[in-house]
Amino acid sequence: MRIGTFNILHGRSPDDGRVDVDRLATAVKSLDCDVLGLQEVDRDQPRSLGADLTAVAADAMGAPEHQFVAALSGTPGGTWMAATGDEQPGSASYGIALLSRYPVVSWRVVRLPPLRASVPLWSTYTRRPFLARDEPRVAVAAVLDGPFGQFTV
């Protein structure tokens, strides 16, 4: 069993800064994970070409079970609001995802508050740091039916 985690930087390559969903799919496939946690996942965001990056990754790794969980609805670094509840926003959103080749018995979402202080971020556009208000945080867990019984990730 292979379990992994991957900060996908909303599909952007750290090498050239371009978003390329085919390159993302190739990277995910090369990991050959049975279960994969993704961070910095976009859905329907202009900066990631309007793609559903969870679906791109799930298809690439052959994961029939997957769940995207939005931390926020809107544009990170721009205008947004915290996503709440179990329902997912129908608009552009940003969050995390969990993908599995094994059947999912149950899912659990935990919403966490943002930090109260602003956090320093690096701007690839201005090439200098700036202070930004922290965004909401979220966690997702699943009970999976694996080859040796049920387990939680």
Each model region followed by its residue ranges:
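Beta-strand-turn-beta hairpins that frame and shape the catalytic cleft
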Residues: M1-I3, I96, S100-V105, V119-L121, ...
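N-terminal, active-site-proximal structural segment of metallo-dependent hydrolase catalytic domains
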Residues: M1-Y94
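Surface-exposed cleft-lining segments at the edges of enzyme active sites
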Residues: G11-P14, L112-L131
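Short secondary-structure junctions
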Residues: P64-Q67, V104-V109
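Membrane-interface segments of envelope glycosyltransferases acting on lipid-linked substrates or membrane lipids
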Residues: G74-T79, W107-R108, L115
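A substrate-binding/cap region within the structured catalytic cores of diverse enzymes
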Residues: T84, Y94-G95, S100, V109-P113, ...
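A short catalytic or substrate-binding loop motif that flags glycine-/basic-rich loops and adjacent residues
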Residues: P89-S91, A132-P136
